Design a protein with these regions (language model features):
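Cyclic nucleotide-binding regulatory module and flanking cytosolic helices
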Residues: 1-54, 97-99, 104
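Short loop/turn motifs at secondary-structure junctions and domain boundaries
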Residues: 41-42, 58-62, 178
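Cyclic nucleotide-binding regulatory domains
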Residues: 56-115
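Short aromatic/basic micro-patch
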Residues: 68, 92, 121, 187, ...
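Cyclic-nucleotide recognition modules
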Residues: 91-150
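Polybasic "coupling" helices that flank or enter modular domains
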Residues: 132-201
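Phosphate-/nucleic-acid-contacting segments
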Residues: 174-238
Length: 238
C-alpha cells in the first residue's frame, strides 16, 4: 500500500511498502539539495509522496532501477548481503538526499528505511526525458552522478584506514552533512555504523570510548555525538 499526497505522476506500487504517518524529523537537521535547484523542483512537481515504515525494504538488489527517490524525512541505508552472510552498508541518505541513481538498469544495492520515512519518488524515464529538454535538470543529474562517484571513491579510501581513522572520518562526514555545528543526533545504530565502516560493533564502541577519553568527542547517549575537538578528528582523518 502507498500514500500519494501530491504530484502528477502515478505513484509506483511496491510489495514491501507500508502507508502510515511519519513522525517528526530527528533533532538534527541535515543539509540536502537546495529547494530551488532544477532537479529538486522537478521531483517535487512530477513525483509522488510515499511513506515506508522503519526497516521496510524500499527496493531490492537487482530489482529494476525504474525510480529515483528524494528523502523528505527520516533516513535510508543502502546495503548488500555478502556471500558469507555479512551485511555491507553502501551509504546513508538523509533529508534532502537523492538515492536510487544507477549506472545500469538494475539496483546494485538494496535500500531500506532506517526510521519511518517519507520520500518523493519520480520515474527515472520521466526525469531522463526532462533532462533531454532542460539544461538545468541535466546539469543537476550530472552533478548528482559525480557526487555518487566521489562518495564511492571516498569509501574505497576509507576502508584501508585504521578503526580510529574510519570512525573519525564518519563523524566528520555526518557533521558536514548536518546543519548543526557540533552536536549530531545519529539516526543509525552502532551496528549500522559498523557495517558501513567494515568494523565490528565492539570495535566501533571501543573507538568511540577512546575518542571520548581523549576529549575529542562527548557521547551523552548512544545516538548523540558532540564533537569537542574537530582538529583532533581531522588529524585522524588525514
Amino acid at each position: 500500500m502507498l500514500t500519494q499526497t501530491t504530484g502528477r505522476s502515478e505513484a509506483p506500487s511496491h510489495p514491501t511498502m507500508f502507508a502510515r504517518s511519519v513522525p517528526p524529523a530527528p533533532q538534527t537537521a541535515y543539509k540536502g539539495a537546495p529547494a530551488s535547484d532544477p532537479l529538486t523542483q522537478q521531483i517535487q512537481l512530477m513525483g509522488a509522496t510515499m511513506t515506508f515504515s522503519r526497516n521496510a525494504e524500499i527496493f531490492g538488489e537487482n530489482e529494476p532501477a525504474d525510480y529515483l527517490y528524494k528523502v523528505i524525512s527520516g533516513a535510508v541505508r543502502t546495503y548488500k548481503i555478502l556471500s558469507d552472510g555479512r551485511r555491507q552498508i553502501g551509504g546513508f541518505y538523509l533529508p534532502g538526499d537523492v538515492f536510487g541513481l544507477e549506472f545500469a538498469d538494475e539496483h546494485s544495492l538494496a535500500a531500506e528505511a532506517i526510521t519511518d520515512i517519507k520520500v518523493r519518488v519520480i520515474k527515472r524515464s520521466a526525469l531522463a526525458a526532462l533532462a533531454d529538454r532542460n539544461a538545468g535538470t541535466a546539469r543537476e543529474l550530472y552533478a548528482l552522478t559525480a557526487c555518487e562517484l566521489r562518495r564511492a571513491q571516498a569509501r574505497i579510501l576509507l576502508l584501508v584506514k585504521s578503526a580510529q581513522e574510519r570512525v573519525a572520518s564518519f563523524l566528520l562526514e555526518m557533521a558536514e552533512r548536518a546543519a548543526a555545528d557540533n552536536a549530531i543526533d545519529l539516526p543509525m545504530s552502532r551496528q549500522d555504523i559498523a557495517d558501513y565502516l567494515g568494523l565490528t560493533i565492539e570495535t566501533v564502541s571501543r573507538t568511540l570510548t577512546a575518542l571520548e577519553t581523549a576529549a575529542a568527542i562527548d557521547v551523552p547517549t548512544s545516538r548523540r555525538i558532540v564533537l569537542r575537538n574537530r582538529g583532533a578528528l581531522s588529524r585522524l582523518n588525514g
